[in-house]
């Protein structure tokens, strides 16, 4: 039994010594850091003729300036009226390519952004933001369908 205790003590001391050495080695290592230029996040959402799915709520938080006319379409996959509006938004994104940015905002994932704009509790809700700070909101599809109604609203900005 005494042999076992001596062996256990020797193993414990040996492992402590190795731990200290590796700790010293870690401190001696240098790390090379590479600087990478990253495009501004706003460049992710350009008026390129597509509807972008929001992946960063901070980009369009209340009070944030937008570089061009921007449509935030607050919707959910389970919402029938939202599914009626989606093809119209996609067509308008193509029609207004280069002029208007279209963003689809899933309220199940970004409910706090929806609430931050005080748009009520119904969807679909569309918020139009202009670079000069003006905004307009529409709840439901009555003012936005057919497509020509929605286009007239965009043209009024």
Language model region names:
Residues 68-70, 74-78, 122:
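Short pre-active-site segment immediately N-terminal to redox-active cysteine/selenocysteine motifs
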Residues 2-7:
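Sec-dependent signal peptide recognition
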Residues 14-15:
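C-terminal motif of bacterial Sec signal peptides marking the signal peptidase cleavage site
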Residues 118-128:
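Structural micro-motif
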Residues 82-96:
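Typically the conserved alpha-helix immediately C-terminal to a functionally engaged Cys/Sec
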Residues 128-157:
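Non-catalytic, surface beta->alpha helical segment in thiol-disulfide oxidoreductase systems
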Residues 74, 93, 98-112:
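Thiol-based oxidoreductase modules, predominantly thioredoxin-like and allied folds used
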Residues 43-69:
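A short beta-strand-turn-helix
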């Amino acid at each position: 039994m005494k042999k076992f205790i001596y062996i256990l003590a020797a193993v414990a001391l040996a492992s402590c010594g190795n731990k200290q050495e590796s700790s010293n080695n870690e401190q001696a290592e240098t790390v090379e850091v590479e600087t990478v230029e990253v495009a501004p996040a706003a460049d992710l959402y350009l008026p390129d003729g597509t509807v972008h799915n929001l992946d960063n709520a901070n980009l369009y938080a209340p009070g944030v300036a937008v570089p061009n006319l921007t449509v935030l379409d607050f919707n959910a996959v389970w919402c029938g009226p939202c599914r009626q509006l989606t093809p119209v938004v996609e067509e308008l994104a193509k029609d207004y390519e280069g002029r208007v940015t279209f963003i689809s905002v899933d309220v199940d994932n970004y409910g706090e952004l929806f609430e931050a704009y005080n748009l009520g509790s119904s969807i679909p809700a569309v918020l139009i933001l202009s670079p000069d700070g003006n905004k307009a909101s529409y709840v439901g599809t009555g003012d936005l369908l057919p497509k020509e109604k929605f286009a007239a609203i965009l043209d009024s900005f």
